């Protein structure tokens, strides 16, 4: 074998090893990002019955991982006070599953909503081990399909997202024209800007980020009215992020900033203001011109 041939074989082997190492490194980075972002919680310690709410268990089929197996997403359906109640898809944030979101779900039900709430894959009783951005979007879309079956009238279909769930809800609203109204609470502009806000600004996060959740780029495409809610003392997600999302969103839109509210207690601190903002928003949606509702009536 000539020196050139041996050199070529060595180079090919080195390139193959580099490709494997690079792929392994990318897979590791992706896994660690998903772990850091979602921090999925399994233990279900309470149900809607613990809060005096009637409910039904919901199981939704979604696409599985690369092996092609099907997976199931678990949720709760909490009927409204009457047949004309607005119906809301509840999308929670990171770290906490549905059982830790029941206080917020109960409050929305108290305001008159029927609620369909789901756990993303990896959370609660849903299948899967570690969710991804794409899978969270898929799970929300499957839940929206179920909401359509539960509520035939598109004028009464709403989506709500808290924190990370707000990013999922914004993506959902860009995919579906039949979202009558969107409520996002304590949410962020993008994962890259969240990394900056948490002190990683000197690290080239954009070069390695695999989970983007870029709501600031997407919110301009949302056709539904949007209500943004944020506490001014939120130490996890700066309220300024909701202000920027509000500025980027098309009309009609509303913004409620709750003085001294933190990441989770906005409605508790200022329930009257919170409820008034939600009711005003429902009236805004109800009173939209017929032409603006036409595409929603067709679905998406």
Language model features by range: what are they?
Residues 270-300:
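Catalytic active-site module of serine/aspartate enzymes centered on a nucleophile-bearing elbow/loop
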